[in-house]
């Protein structure tokens, strides 16, 4: 009976840690070195911000490469070498031809830079 009681306590502990958020806490992101393939349309953003990072990219007002403003969510890839900023990547997965000409980066809908920026394929923005 004592073995069953210990097993039951262990299972309850694991369950509470897992679903209570204790066992699955994220660890510090790994240092990331940007990588691309020649045929992809992508950009990188280095920023200390972590909340709802998005990219808005276009050729003209009729040719958007992202969802409507503020755009598509960027993927957290890791950190810079000294760990002071996160590196995000966005890769276009649609069927439009060409490469965007303009880009805006946002956090929670707020622009990082007040003006539109030129889009550079595989560009690294800081």
Predicted regions and their residues:
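A short, solvent-exposed beta-strand micro-motif common in secreted/extracellular proteins
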Residues: 98-109
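Low-complexity, acidic Ser/Thr/Pro-rich repeat tracts that form intrinsically disordered stalk/linker regions
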Residues: 23-38
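Structural beta-strand segments of beta-rich domains
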Residues: 39-43
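Bacterial N-terminal signal peptides
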Residues: 9-21
């Amino acid at each position: 009976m004592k073995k069953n009681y210990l097993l039951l306590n262990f299972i309850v502990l694991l369950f509470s840690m897992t679903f209570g958020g204790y066992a699955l806490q994220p660890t510090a992101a790994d240092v990331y070195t940007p990588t691309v393939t020649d045929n992809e349309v992508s950009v990188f953003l280095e920023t200390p911000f972590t909340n709802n990072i998005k990219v808005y990219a276009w050729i003209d007002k009729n040719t958007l490469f992202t969802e409507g403003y503020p755009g598509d969510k960027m993927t957290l890839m890791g950190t810079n070498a000294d760990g002071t900023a996160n590196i995000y990547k966005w890769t276009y997965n649609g069927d439009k031809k060409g490469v965007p000409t303009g880009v805006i980066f946002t956090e929670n809908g707020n622009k990082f830079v007040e003006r539109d920026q030129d889009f550079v394929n595989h560009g690294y923005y800081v």
